[in-house]
């Protein structure tokens, strides 16, 4: 028996049983729920459904235990093979969207500036799409890896992302509609910060005053993830100083034993 599985899964089952009784769920309603979950699986929306309603809660718990910059949901559009870039993310020449500069530092949780940290950056096109995922957009557009310099600094120029809808024609979108919600996410930029010997940080940041910032369908926005509206020479600037924490000794030991 797996004690952790028994603890968590058992608590979930008991909570659901209590809701079924408290809300006097009928046999017909129960069967409708079974049919709904079957449809979710058949349309391959299981991950989408869980991410929309529950992922932010997992991140909230992680943030309460962390000494790092605020973590956030990763989303489905991270790709490991993004190229290393220096100063500029590739964007289409036809883009008429606003430029964006992202800059800052990476530090340890004890304040040490970290050279050689790798920062994956990815965000939507001005059409709300993602490279390597949608419409045959090349994987080296609108995403890339940055490497911090000897002083822990990084800087990259790109274009402003836009709000976009999650898949809305399937069962997840339908459930959001039943709940009186919508399927829009606010404009945001994703980051994954990594360095050997440190815990990876996955997060995303939003824009002050942006549409849907106060009503994200995935409940992923918290106040510390909203960047102020800073304009320099007519260009929006996002300044982010990331803090990552060292791996714990027991985690390093576990990883070594797994490899062995």
Swiss-Prot record:
<dbReference type="InterPro" id="IPR012817">
    <property type="entry name" value="Chlorcchol_dOase"/>
</dbReference>
<keyword id="KW-0058">Aromatic hydrocarbons catabolism</keyword>
<feature type="binding site">
    <location>
        <position position="188"/>
    </location>
    <ligand>
        <name>Fe cation</name>
    </ligand>
</feature>
<feature type="binding site">
    <location>
        <position position="164"/>
    </location>
    <ligand>
        <name>Fe cation</name>
    </ligand>
</feature>
<keyword id="KW-0223">Dioxygenase</keyword>
<feature type="binding site">
    <location>
        <position position="190"/>
    </location>
    <ligand>
        <name>Fe cation</name>
    </ligand>
</feature>
<dbReference type="Pfam" id="PF00775">
    <property type="entry name" value="Dioxygenase_C"/>
</dbReference>
<comment type="similarity">
    <text>Belongs to the intradiol ring-cleavage dioxygenase family.</text>
</comment>
<keyword id="KW-0479">Metal-binding</keyword>
<dbReference type="InterPro" id="IPR007535">
    <property type="entry name" value="Catechol_dOase_N"/>
</dbReference>
<keyword id="KW-0614">Plasmid</keyword>
<dbReference type="InterPro" id="IPR000627">
    <property type="entry name" value="Intradiol_dOase_C"/>
</dbReference>
<protein>
    <recommendedName>
        <fullName>Chlorocatechol 1,2-dioxygenase</fullName>
        <ecNumber>1.13.11.-</ecNumber>
    </recommendedName>
</protein>
<dbReference type="InterPro" id="IPR015889">
    <property type="entry name" value="Intradiol_dOase_core"/>
</dbReference>
<dbReference type="GO" id="GO:0009056">
    <property type="term" value="P:catabolic process"/>
</dbReference>
<feature type="binding site">
    <location>
        <position position="130"/>
    </location>
    <ligand>
        <name>Fe cation</name>
    </ligand>
</feature>
<dbReference type="GO" id="GO:0008199">
    <property type="term" value="F:ferric iron binding"/>
</dbReference>
<dbReference type="GO" id="GO:0009712">
    <property type="term" value="P:catechol-containing compound metabolic process"/>
</dbReference>
<comment type="pathway">
    <text>Aromatic compound metabolism; 3-chlorocatechol degradation.</text>
</comment>
<keyword id="KW-0408">Iron</keyword>
<comment type="function">
    <text>Preferentially converts 3-chlorocatechol and 3,5-dichlorocatechol as opposed to other chlorinated catechols. Retains diminished activity toward non-chlorinated substrates.</text>
</comment>
<keyword id="KW-0560">Oxidoreductase</keyword>
<dbReference type="Pfam" id="PF04444">
    <property type="entry name" value="Dioxygenase_N"/>
</dbReference>
<dbReference type="InterPro" id="IPR050770">
    <property type="entry name" value="Intradiol_RC_Dioxygenase"/>
</dbReference>
<dbReference type="GO" id="GO:0018576">
    <property type="term" value="F:catechol 1,2-dioxygenase activity"/>
</dbReference>
């Amino acid at each position: 028996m797996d004690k952790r599985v028994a603890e968590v899964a058992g608590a979930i089952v008991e909570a659901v049983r209590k809701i079924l009784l408290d809300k006097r769920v009928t046999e017909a309603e129960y069967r409708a729920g079974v049919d709904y979950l079957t449809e979710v699986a058949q349309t391959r929306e299981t991950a989408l459904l869980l991410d929309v309603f529950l992922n932010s809660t997992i991140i909230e718990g992680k943030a309460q235990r962390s000494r790092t910059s605020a973590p956030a949901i990763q989303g489905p559009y991270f790709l490991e093979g993004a190229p290393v870039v220096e100063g500029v993310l590739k964007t289409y020449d036809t883009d008429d969207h606003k430029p964006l500069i992202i800059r800052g530092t990476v530090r340890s949780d004890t304040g040490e500036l970290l050279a050689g940290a790798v920062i994956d950056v990815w965000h939507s096109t001005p059409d709300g799409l993602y490279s390597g995922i949608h419409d045959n957009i090349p994987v080296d557009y609108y995403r890339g890896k940055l490497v911090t310099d000897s002083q822990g600094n990084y800087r990259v120029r790109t274009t402003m992302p836009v709000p976009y809808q999650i898949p809305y024609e399937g069962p997840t979108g339908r459930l959001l509609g039943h709940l009186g919600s919508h399927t829009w996410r606010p404009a945001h930029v994703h980051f994954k910060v990594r360095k050997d010997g440190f815990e990876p940080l996955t997060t995303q940041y939003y824009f002050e005053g942006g549409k849907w910032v106060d009503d994200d369908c995935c409940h992923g926005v918290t106040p510390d993830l909203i960047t102020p509206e800073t304009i320099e020479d007519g260009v929006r600037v996002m300044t982010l100083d990331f803090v990552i924490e060292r791996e714990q000794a027991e985690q390093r030991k576990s990883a070594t034993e797994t490899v062995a």
